[in-house]
Each structure stands twice: as structure tokens, then as C-alpha cells.
């Protein structure tokens, strides 16, 4: 498996912390560029906002509510012309636990 011809690896990352996500993207792009693969990205995708509405009081006062939100930041990185060296380097890469990674070949 020297070189995969006309293939690409699509890496989809998502996290609640934007700075953590950006540092992970930089590590992946640097690793791909060091192994002579072309990395395109990170391409930012729309941020998902999830809002939770909670009653403040445990008893009455339904008019008094509190809103909480979580923001999920997402990025896509495409790696073209990956070699087996590229795949091995990506597998050994140490990324933070707050980042969710999905890889498609």
C-alpha cells in the first residue's frame, strides 16, 4: 500500500471548545504536510447551538425560567494522496479528549 491513487481521507472534527478544535486541526494539517500529502482545510462548518430551557424554581413560578446553551463547533479536513506513512502518522497523533473525530476513507 505505497500510495493510494486518487483517494482522499476526510476527517470531520467537532468540539465544544473552539480553541481546542483549532489546535487539533493544526496538528492534523502539519502531520499531513510532513508526510508529503496535500491537506485542504480546516473548513469551518456551521456552529450548532442547542438551547435548554429549565424552570428556576422546583415548585411554582413557571414564568421564571433559565436558558442554557451548548455550542458545537465543527471542521472538515481533506487529505489528498495519502500514503501509508501518512496514515501511520495520523494514527499515532495524540489529540485531546474534548475533540470528537470521524474519519472516512
UniProtKB/Swiss-Prot annotation:
* Family per similarity comment: Belongs to the universal ribosomal protein uS10 family.
Keyword tRNA processing in the entry? The reply is no
**PANTHER family, per the entry:** 30S RIBOSOMAL PROTEIN S10 FAMILY MEMBER
Is Ribosomal protein set as a keyword in this record? yes
Q: Name one GO molecular function term.
A: structural constituent of ribosome
Listed under subunit, the entry gives: Part of the 30S ribosomal subunit.
Q: Name one Pfam family in it.
A: Ribosomal_S10
Which Gene Ontology cellular-component terms appear in the entry?
Answer: ribonucleoprotein complex; ribosome
Specify the protein name: Small ribosomal subunit protein uS10
Keywords, A to Z, come to: Ribonucleoprotein, Ribosomal protein
Which superkingdom is the protein from? Bacteria
In terms of InterPro entries, this protein maps to: Ribosomal_uS10 (IPR001848), Ribosomal_uS10_CS (IPR018268), Ribosomal_uS10_dom (IPR027486), Ribosomal_uS10_dom_sf (IPR036838)
Sum up the protein's function in the record's words.
Involved in the binding of tRNA to the ribosomes.
Tell me a GO biological process for this protein. translation
Supply the source organism for this entry. Answer: Nostoc punctiforme (strain ATCC 29133 / PCC 73102)
